[in-house]
């Protein structure tokens, strides 16, 4: 097994040649190959290959240029670092080189330098990655202790990176014409909305500082012209004439700037805004975190800002502008990233639950039920002769939650599994806010006024499971803290089994970092706070179940062009829908047989020409 790196004349899509391949098997002796046949002989003789981002770059590059098929085990230190170094802002070899005292040589020209210069860069990368691999392996062994369990986890990371690499290589057809039209339309709408917002935001006061003149009196003792202006100003400000400090005066009023975050926040604060969403910025020098209130999240106003709209309709203008700007950025991102009529579903990391972090342009896409969602998803289409299949696991997180609850509270889980069960109205009933007769009437369409009540209990159902407290719930819903606490109390009375499950889990602390083991996958997951135990285990179980389903499916078909949370987007030849559905259903059956969860997992399958047709 070797640690290796390659240098080529370009990125994967445009590379035409490999300059060199450097490697080591012991961290002491480093060799560099320039001959393609030597590279083939070396790579094909290895049972295992270690590298940084090799699944998505080095390996497909070698296969493309050398015309070989690599079957060795792949140990990719990039996703390993994502898991272990979860607070690290950069995971590139240059960053690790600074840590290890091995500077990464800087090269900007990949066509015209000598092969010795490329070889030097390549060798230094291998030195850095050897040190990184040794560090990662040692730290993972502290967590897993069992080599078989760790090997299973490494295989899992290899699989996930292979899924990402395959999707990137296939690409996703983009309707360039539709994206271009939407950019033009939204650019005009943005301009109109900015002008409208300027009419409802308060004007900005322009001030100046006035100071007492050096000479206020003439030689004859009379007041000078400068002195007269100063004393008049003091009189206007109702200040005594002996005052000699600074005076702030209003010079005029400027139009507001809707693109100024500071001005928008000042306006919202004047309306009684109480922020519920924050970003934490860390000071690199002091290490202290600064809590920054957020007006927007994922392209929409935060819940606490939306609460202002009922009493301040002008805030709805800000909501409209926020949505327009977010959607415009998506369409523009499509066009910026388009290449030969395609975009890629690229990844940018892993969460602590091992879900993909997605990368521009396919990130945070609004659903078809949201403003411009149909157009956004409608830009992603299938090429001629193909159709898209959207396959997602139905109620994945809720199913995983019921799996963990059932050993403690089987009666409630059975009730939750009944057709037509509404967890939000059930919680309201359990809290004494409504009766079963009210729920039945609502389901018949006779009590539409319960919709607002249901919305609040829906927020509680989703957020309480993940550790929300009454102050934050109050800010998000507009309820008093007392009301919010009452809802949380009702939730935990109904869902006591969640806490019972959490209490049964063991948290390990290693070098001041907390880790918890998933009971289904047996993988270890990092924890920031103890309150995150259930959310981490529930979401990671969902991610693992989804990935296992995808793994079974890929044994029959490898045509996935995108994965988002609990859905997979597959490219299918027209006329093969039945065979494709058979493969998806076979995969979920195999998964249920394999995992034997307390609640069976299910899937939903839809076909269409555009992403908007299938999800």
Residue ranges of model-derived segments:
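Conserved "right-hand" nucleotidyltransferase catalytic core of DNA-directed polymerases
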Residues: 1-7, 104, 115-372, 381, ...
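Active-site-proximal helix-loop-helix substrate-binding element of RNase H-like nuclease domains
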Residues: 12, 16-23, 27-36, 42-142, ...
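Short active-site loop/helix that positions an aromatic residue
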Residues: 21, 55-67, 82, 264-272, ...
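Cytochrome P450 catalytic domain signature, combining two hallmark sequence patches
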Residues: 69-72, 191, 273-280, 405-418, ...
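Conserved catalytic core of nucleic-acid polymerases
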Residues: 165, 223, 343-344, 348-351, ...
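Function-dense linear segments that define catalytic or interfacial modules
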Residues: 346-445
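Short hydrophobic/aromatic beta-strand micro-patches
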Residues: 569-573
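Short amphipathic alpha-helices in soluble, non-transmembrane regions
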Residues: 580-588
């Amino acid at each position: 097994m070797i640690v290796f790196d390659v240098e080529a004349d370009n990125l994967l899509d445009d590379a035409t040649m490999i300059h060199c391949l450097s490697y080591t098997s012991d961290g002491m002796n480093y060799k560099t190959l320039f001959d393609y046949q030597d590279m083939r002989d070396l790579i094909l003789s290895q049972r295992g290959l270690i590298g940084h981002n090799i699944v998505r770059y080095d390996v497909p590059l070698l296969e493309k240029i050398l015309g070989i098929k690599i079957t060795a085990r792949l140990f990719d230190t990039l996703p390993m670092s994502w898991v272990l170094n979860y607070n690290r802002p950069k995971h590139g070899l240059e960053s690790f080189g600074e840590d290890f005292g091995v500077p990464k040589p800087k090269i900007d020209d990949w066509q015209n330098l000598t092969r010795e210069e490329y070889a030097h860069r390549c060798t230094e990368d291998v030195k850095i990655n050897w040190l990184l691999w040794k560090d990662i392996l040692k730290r993972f062994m502290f967590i897993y202790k069992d080599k078989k369990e760790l090997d299973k986890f490494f295989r899992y990371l290899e699989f996930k990176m292979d899924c990402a690499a395959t999707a990137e290589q296939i690409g996703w057809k983009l309707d360039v014409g539709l994206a271009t039209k939407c950019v033009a339309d939204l650019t005009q709408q943005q301009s109109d909305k900015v002008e409208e917002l300027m009419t409802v935001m308060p004007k900005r006061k322009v001030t100046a500082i006035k100071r007492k003149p050096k000479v206020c009196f003439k030689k004859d003792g009379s007041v000078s012209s400068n002195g007269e202006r100063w004393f008049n100003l003091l009189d206007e400000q109702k200040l005594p004439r002996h005052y000699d400090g600074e005076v702030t005066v209003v010079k005029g009023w400027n139009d507001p700037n809707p693109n100024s975050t500071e001005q928008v926040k000042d306006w919202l604060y004047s309306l009684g805004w109480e922020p519920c969403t924050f970003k934490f910025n860390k000071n690199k020098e002091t290490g202290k975190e600064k809590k920054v209130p957020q007006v927007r999240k994922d392209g929409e106003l935060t819940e606490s800002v939306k609460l202002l709209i009922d009493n301040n309709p002008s805030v709805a203008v800000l909501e409209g502008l926020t949505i327009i700007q977010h959607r415009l950025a998506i369409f523009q991102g499509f066009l910026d990233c388009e290449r030969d009529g395609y975009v890629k579903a690229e990844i940018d990391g892993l969460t602590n639950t091992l879900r993909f972090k997605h990368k521009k342009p396919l990130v945070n896409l609004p659903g078809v039920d949201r403003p411009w969602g149909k157009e956004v998803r409608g830009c992603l289409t299938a090429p001629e002769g193909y159709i898209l299949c959207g396959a997602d696991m139905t109620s994945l997180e809720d199913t995983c939650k019921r799996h963990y609850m059932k050993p403690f509270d089987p009666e409630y889980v059975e009730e939750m599994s009944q057709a037509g069960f509404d967890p939000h109205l059930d919680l309201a009933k359990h809290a004494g806010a409504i009766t079963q007769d009210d729920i039945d009437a609502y389901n018949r369409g006779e009590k539409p006024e319960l919709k607002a009540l249901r919305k609040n209990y829906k927020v509680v159902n989703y957020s309480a499971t993940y550790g929300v407290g009454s102050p934050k719930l109050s800010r998000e819903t507009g309820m008093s803290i007392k009301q919010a606490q009452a809802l949380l109390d009702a939730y935990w009375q109904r869902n006591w089994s969640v806490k019972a499950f959490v209490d049964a889990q063991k948290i390990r602390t290693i070098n001041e970092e907390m880790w918890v083991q998933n009971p289904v996958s047996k993988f270890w997951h990092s924890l920031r706070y103890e309150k995150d135990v259930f959310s981490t285990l529930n979401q990671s179980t969902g991610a693992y179940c989804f990935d296992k389903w995808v793994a079974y499916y890929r044994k029959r078909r490898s045509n996935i062009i995108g994965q988002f949370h609990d859905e997979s987007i597959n490219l299918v030849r027209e006329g093969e829908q039945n065979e494709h559905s058979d493969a998806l259903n076979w995969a979920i059956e195999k998964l249920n047989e394999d995992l034997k969860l307390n609640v069976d997992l299910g899937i939903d399958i839809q076909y269409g020409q555009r992403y908007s047709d299938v999800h």
